[in-house]
From Swiss-Prot:
Residues bound to heme 2: M154, C179, C182, H183
Protein name, as recorded: Cytochrome c-554
PROSITE patterns xrefs: MULTIHEME_CYTC
InterPro entries linked: Cyt554Puf2C (IPR054997), Multihaem_cyt_PRC_cyt_su-like (IPR023119), Multihaem_cyt_sf (IPR036280), Photosyn_RC_cyt_c-su (IPR003158)
Molecular function as annotated in GO: electron transfer activity; heme binding; iron ion binding
GO cellular component: periplasmic space; plasma membrane light-harvesting complex
Cell compartments where the protein resides: Periplasm
CDD domains: CytoC_RC
Function statement: Serves as the immediate electron donor to the oxidized BChl2 (bacteriochlorophyll dimer) that is oxidized in the first step of light-induced charge separation. Can also oxidize low-potential substrates.
Lineage of the organism: Bacteria, Bacillati, Chloroflexota, Chloroflexia, Chloroflexales
Origin species: Chloroflexus aurantiacus (strain ATCC 29366 / DSM 635 / J-10-fl)
Post-translational modification, as annotated: Binds 4 heme groups per subunit. The N-terminus is blocked.
UniProt keyword terms in alphabetical order: Electron transport, Heme, Iron, Metal-binding, Periplasm, Photosynthesis, Signal, Transport
Residues that hold heme 3 according to the record: M283, C294, C297, H298
């Protein structure tokens, strides 16, 4: 009778496999333990920081932890703890001397103390600069620096963007833009496009055939805007649509073919392959900017549709149609910004900045007055979040006097 006892060779194999499994488990556990000690916690903390809502303390920390600067245009240093303290002390002295406002043109109706609190926390903090960046702190009413004129006009910009584009969004969720929404603790050279756009869009040339006001393709180069009469790099074609978007058939819930704009792939013979490529990459840029996929705005079985109340269970995101309408409104916003940027006090640049502290070249546009400006794009505010982390929701604005210094009613747009 044959023995059922395993042979020595079989036992050796079993023991070897068991030891191997134990060693593999211990090695893997040790690796992840060491990884967590060295990198894991830091990465988790970085992720939490990246996903945290903006706070005025973020910008104030940038100011107080930075080295001083040496202005050459007559302004005083605005960075560092000393500059911050000097600005705070000067502001406190000013509101004691002038409890009623002097030379206030936008935040009319607020007291000097209210304006001072708002400016210190939500303007200085938003831009990551001390009071001296815009003000002669010996005379806060003075308009001697162009940065103050620009800031005043930017308050008008916040008001008008909220009024014209934000509070009347389809399915508005109560979010407003504020200074920090664009600035995120930096006064200028704001990045409008981001690493994914810069690194992922291929360096190929395409022919842009824009649509006219009737939704018909313009094929004659002589009839096109000068910037796109010849083939251009795909990145520049994307920029053209970000800053030159129109709606030629406004949305009507009773018309399934409405809600069509510059990026529509028309049914009359279709568009060229170049136009499809441009369209796809504009969508990619928006998706990268918001940190979302196609179904955030689209029904994947019918990309053209707007179904405000979709039936059935085959729609991943039942609010997608509202998001699609919002995205169209945001393209109208970036177009409006490019058209109106100079009149809101933006300071032109003699040339596109390069080197340390500059944004990518795509963040600078030569506008209608022939000058170069740092113009916002989708990424400027969103930075990978479908709701910008530096926006502010009405639920977070206290009622009554306390809310006035968080987001003044004068710039909420309603």
């Amino acid at each position: 009778m044959q023995s059922s006892r395993p042979s020595d060779r079989q036992l050796a194999i079993v023991v070897s496999v068991a030891v191997g499994i134990v060693v593999a488990v211990i090695t893997t556990a040790t690796f992840w333990w060491v990884y967590d000690l060295t990198l894991g916690r830091a990465q988790r903390e970085a992720a939490q920081t990246a996903g945290a809502r903006w706070s005025p303390s973020d910008g104030i920390k940038v100011i107080t932890s930075s080295p001083p600067v040496t202005p050459t245009d007559g302004r005083q240093n605005w960075m560092g703890t000393q500059a911050w303290n000097e600005g705070v002390q000067a502001g406190q002295a000013w509101i004691q001397q002038y409890p009623n406002t002097v030379n206030v043109q936008v935040l009319i109706g607020m007291s000097s103390a209210q304006i001072w609190t708002y400016m210190q926390q939500y303007v200085s903090g938003a831009l990551g600069v001390g009071c001296q960046y815009c003000h002669n702190i010996n005379n806060f009413a003075s308009d001697e620096y162009p940065q103050k004129i620009a800031a005043r006009n930017m308050l008008r910009l916040v008001r008008d963007v909220n009024a014209e584009f934000i509070v009347n969004l389809p399915n508005w969720q109560g979010n407003y833009v504020q200074c920090a929404t664009c600035h995120n603790n930096a006064p200028n050279n704001l990045e409008g496009f981001g690493a994914q756009f810069i690194n992922s869009v291929p360096p190929i040339k395409v022919t842009v055939d824009p649509l006219d006001a009737n939704g018909m393709a313009i094929l004659d180069p002589a009839q096109k805007p000068e910037a796109i009469r010849e083939p251009v790099l795909l990145k520049d074609a994307i920029l053209f649509y970000i800053y030159n978007y129109q709606v030629w058939k406004p949305f009507d819930p009773n018309d399934p073919e409405s809600g069509r704009g510059s990026l529509a792939l028309t049914y009359d013979g279709g568009r060229t392959q170049d136009q499809v490529t441009i369209n796809q990459n504009v969508m990619n840029y928006q998706a990268w900017s918001l940190g979302v996929g196609c179904t955030f705005c689209h029904n994947s079985r019918n990309f053209v549709a707007y179904e405000l109340n979709p039936a059935g269970d085959n729609v991943l995101n039942p609010l997608y149609a509202y998001n699609k309408l919002k995205a169209q409104r945001m393209l109208l916003l970036t177009t409006w910004l490019a058209e109106n940027w100079p009149r809101y006090g933006a300071i032109a640049k003699p040339e596109i900045p390069t080197g340390s502290g500059a944004a990518s070249r795509y963040s600078y546009q030569r506008l209608g007055d022939g000058q170069i400006y740092n113009v916002p794009g989708c990424y400027t505010c969103h930075q990978g979040n479908n709701i910008p982390l530096a926006s502010i929701n009405q639920a977070n604005i206290p009622s009554g006097d306390a809310g006035i210094v968080v987001l003044p009613p004068q710039i909420r747009g309603r």
